[in-house]
Amino acid sequence: MASTAAPPAALVARRAASASVAAPLRGAGLAAGCQPARSLAFAAGADPRLAVHVASRCRAASAARGTRAVATMAKKSVGDLTAADLEGKRVLVRADLNVPLDDNQNITDDTRIRAAIPTIKYLLSNGAKVILTSHLGRPKGVTPKFSLAPLVPRLSELLGIEVKKAEDVIGPEVEKLVADLANGAVLLLENVRFYKEEEKNDPEFAKKLASLADLFVNDAFGTAHRAHASTEGVTKFLKPSVAGFLLQKELDYLDGAVSNPKRPFAAIVGGSKVSSKIGVIESLLEKCDILLLGGGMIFTFYKAQGLSVGSSLVEEDKLELATSLLAKAKAKGVSLLLPSDVIIADKFAPDANSQTVPASAIPDGWMGLDIGPDSVKTFNDALDTTQTIIWNGPMGVFEFDKFAVGTESIAKKLAELSKKGVTTIIGGGDSVAAVEKVGVADVMSHISTGGGASLELLEGKELPGVVALDEGVMTRSVTV
């Protein structure tokens, strides 16, 4: 069977079909609500080296966990502001309007523009004057092809008003346009990255930008992990500085729901390299009950356990790390599932020959590019036991249709579970492209708009653009 290659693919754990595996699990202190033995263990026939570091039980739902209070510091949101706070006020809104354009400057995907609309409409409905700022691409100075001009028609259409555009970001001409702005009107500034001072977080530039407004709303989650002038710098000069609806939703799901999830809580982590997901895996091991690993990173885990991986992608300098992560999962009682079968290819190409083999039987000269059907079944069985799922990273080289089955199967499973009330969070990046490709994006509980910002938040890092905002009300929730 011909197949295509891409970064080595994900692997999934084999279904527990044997009483010899299941029996010990029943006495492992599993909590009510976990349905572990049948789906969370390796089959007795699986290579023992695949199972050696895997804890096949749901974590901490036993009496050992008990009741836990979780405190989170919320940020003040635009929804906390009333008409009395907003009417007649100049509001600087940092949005993420970094949309793709074709060679004719036509927008090819307006998702980020649509995501910014609720915050803008709320401000307009409360009589504010909105000054909208964003970046587009990575310009080196003023670069016409990175102008925000092509965004004006779509913004105007979605808002139902004529959006005006400035030819600059700061300066006398911009100040005049702001002064002439009526209540309920929108002015779009030019690409803020036309100024090198933006990414340097230059205080003087931030001060000039802030001087245009009375208060600040950050709704650009995709750049919240950067301390730039328009995300962090302006907060030193504008109060209040609050989160927009999109940014708040990202925090609610990627921080709130992940830190204090409905359990059992499963995390699916894919991607080509362990090195790019170390922080995410380590952070999620502190929080999740089940961790499913896929993508090319899996082969580093396999080689660390002494398995032959053929020509699959391996990070030789991360073998010890892979072993330690497996040991950490076992120590914390996290059910870490590895694929039991893999779809392999004889080259990294769409027209490659392919076949399905056990994860322990990858021949020389072949590379893994997707998880196999047994692995998909095992992953799906595990996900059936959960109440919260977060997914970051594809299961295989889904850019090639032949190796997209594993990734698309996971997307469809999450859509099915989301309809049943399971909280499903798509943590940015290629996972978003996957659910959009399958046509199930609208069904998910939350789809993150951030790439690097999503990863850093999942890693437990503080995001400068969020830290700089005004603090909201301390919330406290309890899980049992």
Swiss-Prot record:
Q: MF terms per GO, please?
A: ADP binding; ATP binding; metal ion binding; phosphoglycerate kinase activity
What is this protein identified as? Phosphoglycerate kinase, chloroplastic
**E.C. no:** 2.7.2.3
Transit pept. (range) = 1-72
Amino-acid positions noted as binding ATP in the UniProt annotation, renumbered to this chain: K277, G296, G368, E399, D430, S431
Positions binding ADP in this chain are G271, G295, F398
Which PANTHER family does the record match to this protein? Answer: PHOSPHOGLYCERATE KINASE, PHOSPHOGLYCERATE KINASE 1, CHLOROPLASTIC-RELATED
Question: What species does this protein belong to?
Answer: Triticum aestivum (Wheat)
Q: What is the annotated quaternary arrangement, including any partners? A: Monomer.
Give binding positions for AMP: K273, K277, G296, G368, E399
